[in-house]
């Protein structure tokens, strides 16, 4: 009897010790799906959406332990619109917890170019769609293939109620960034700029991993990775990319075999958030390391933030116009002028923010893809513009515009009072005008020109935060003499004296208030030309360090400087140059009044150079750290 008891006790003790020695492997299936890249959205909908649906529905129906993770609200929307039968089938698997809605966003956004408002709305619209369609919400940021991750990501994610983040892209780095490692750790906590924290998997391993048919519970590979970190756990993608689809049948069979295995690795067929939930609350796990900083790339990020500049322009204009439209619409609704256009604004936001996808806004898709991207961007601009015009017009009709001359209503969408020089187009011709504010005080103005019964007029105006101001414009009066000096030598107003060199570059800016030179000694503010960027594998992604370390060429061909505009409120010079077959026109502008301390440089470039770079250089003698500063590795 004693022998039996001793034997049982030894078995129990051995089992307990074995259990503690086991490591965990969270195997996270995925079908990485670039909405656009080397194909356009039409092909994604026609080929890659049905492939993803059919292959995963087969696996889900055949292998009871298979769990599939898939992200991107816009892709689910395409499923609903174009493949309604399969869409209804995946709803059942979502209810069963086997098809997992991951990522939380409307699409897998680039986290660096979009504004914080856009990033937040990407999550907002994704979550709203998931709640409405499936009765669930995502809990994580799932970005296997993005080109670096800004420090704001964990803050935005945490304030959106999300708990985790994963990627595998950081291992693409060329150089180590953290001692001898490319990442600060494999699994831990990432702290945002405000102290918020989410769990972060910084190396989830290759998302196209395919398992061989073997008992994964005995995998030395998984065991070694898990034992290399203090959690004794590994989070590992497996599946396919970049055109959707599903993991291989052999991979899923290996997963099922491993789930039944008795080896030192506990296999978990995991949703993308299972690891994060297992470690909540994070404050109870002091073994989790913490990273407090950015996660940047030295490859696949150094060029894509300048590629396809039109996309960046349209995106930023949409972000700005969306904010203005939203503010004006809320005020108009509150004042009873016009109902709040919720559906129009939501549609416009969703139409352009899916193009913030990491191969779209970044400029790394093929040219045909941008025909669809630009189209959507322009439609959203039109929708936001219509909302802004309608809302401002409705409120303006209720304002007191009983003035002696022509009333002009100005609207300020910013959340603070703005004093600026405003350009107004009047429906009448004239060479002399006087302008008065709502208190009857004359304000500075400047006629720019007349054409076809209209006059372009500059007015120095002040408009309250998110508010309106009425100005009275009358014909006649004595125009003021120009207060800004302009010539081929440069420009001068009450704040700055700006001098051009023989190339038309800005060689000096003297701040007259403080008697200080703002341009670094021996330098000039200029356009600089780099003739070769020898990135042949990833030309849209990369600007090589050796390219920008080289000395650039000055642009000095056929330099011509003319005075483009001169008046009491604004003056500008136009600098024309050539380099090879490329032609450059640059307008340098100074103002007077509230914006006298502002210098504008606007470039119009006919670019005829290939495999080359153009850089705007601003070598200043002063710096502004603003709120925080970030130390970068050299």
Question: Where are each of the predicted segments found?
Answer:
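Catalytic and substrate-binding regions of extracellular carbohydrate-active enzymes
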Residues: 342-346, 354-605, 610, 616-617
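Surface-exposed loop and adjacent secondary-structure segments within mature catalytic domains
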Residues: 89-97, 117, 150-209
């Amino acid at each position: 009897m004693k022998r039996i008891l001793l034997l049982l006790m030894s078995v129990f003790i051995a089992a307990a010790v074995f259990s503690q020695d086991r490591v965990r492997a969270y195997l996270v299936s995925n079908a990485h799906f670039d909405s656009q890249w080397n194909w356009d959205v039409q092909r994604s909908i026609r080929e890659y959406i049905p492939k993803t649906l059919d292959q995963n529905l087969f696996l889900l129906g055949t292998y009871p332990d298979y769990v599939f993770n898939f992200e991107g609200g816009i892709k689910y929307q395409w499923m609903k619109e174009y493949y309604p039968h399969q869409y209804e089938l995946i709803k059942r698997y979502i209810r069963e917890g086997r098809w997992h809605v991951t990522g939380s966003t409307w699409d897998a956004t680039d986290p660096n170019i979009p504004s914080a408002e856009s990033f937040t709305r990407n999550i907002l619209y994704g979550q709203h769609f998931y709640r409405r369609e499936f009765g669930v919400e995502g809990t994580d940021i799932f970005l296997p293939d993005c080109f670096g991750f800004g420090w704001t990501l964990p803050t935005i994610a945490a304030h959106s109620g999300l708990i985790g983040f994963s990627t595998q892209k950081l291992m693409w780095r060329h150089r180590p960034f953290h001692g001898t490692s490319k990442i600060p750790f494999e699994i831990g906590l990432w702290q945002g700029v405000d102290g918020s924290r989410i769990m972060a998997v910084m190396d989830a391993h290759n998302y196209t991993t395919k398992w061989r048919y073997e008992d994964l519970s005995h995998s030395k590979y998984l065991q070694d990775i898990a034992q290399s970190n203090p959690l004794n756990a590994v989070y590992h993608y497996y599946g396919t990319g970049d055109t959707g689809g599903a993991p291989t049948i052999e991979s899923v069979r290996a997963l099922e075999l491993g789930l039944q295995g008795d080896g030192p690795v506990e296999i978990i067929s995991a949703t993308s958030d299972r690891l994060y939930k297992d470690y909540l609350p994070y404050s109870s796990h002091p073994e989790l390391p913490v990273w407090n900083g950015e996660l940047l790339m030295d490859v696949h990020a150094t060029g894509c933030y300048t590629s396809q500049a039109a996309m960046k322009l349209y995106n930023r204009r949409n972000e700005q116009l969306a904010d203005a439209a939203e503010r004006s619409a809320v005020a108009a609704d509150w004042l009873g002028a016009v109902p709040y256009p919720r559906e129009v604004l939501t549609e416009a936001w969703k139409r352009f923010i899916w193009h913030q996808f990491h191969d779209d806004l970044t400029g790394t898709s093929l040219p045909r893809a941008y025909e669809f991207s630009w189209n959507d961007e322009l439609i959203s601009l039109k929708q936001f513009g219509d909302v802004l015009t309608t809302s401002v017009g409705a409120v303006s009709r209720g304002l007191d515009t009983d003035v002696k001359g022509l009333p002009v209503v100005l609207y300020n969408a910013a959340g603070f009072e703005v004093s600026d020089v405003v350009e107004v187009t009047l429906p009448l011709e004239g060479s002399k005008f006087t302008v008065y504010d709502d208190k009857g005080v004359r304000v500075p103005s400047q006629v720019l020109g007349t054409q076809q019964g209209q006059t372009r007029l500059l007015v120095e105006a002040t408009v309250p935060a998110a508010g309106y101001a009425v100005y009275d414009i009358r014909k006649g009066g004595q125009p003021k003499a120009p207060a800004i000096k302009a010539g081929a030598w440069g420009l001068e107003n009450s704040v700055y004296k700006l001098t051009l060199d023989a190339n038309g570059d800005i060689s000096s800016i003297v701040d007259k208030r403080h008697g200080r030179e703002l341009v670094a000694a021996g330098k000039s503010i200029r356009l600089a030309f780099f003739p070769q960027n020898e990135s042949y594998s990833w030309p849209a992604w990369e600007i090589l360090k050796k390219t920008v370390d080289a000395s650039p060429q000055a642009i000095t061909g056929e330099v011509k400087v003319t005075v483009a505009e001169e008046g009491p409120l604004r003056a500008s010079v136009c600098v024309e140059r050539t380099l090879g077959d490329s032609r450059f026109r640059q307008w340098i502008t100074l103002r007077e009044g509230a914006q006298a301390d502002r210098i504008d440089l606007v470039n119009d470039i006919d670019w005829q150079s290939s495999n080359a770079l153009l850089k705007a250089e601003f070598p200043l003698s002063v710096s502004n750290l603003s709120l925080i500063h970030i130390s970068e590795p050299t």
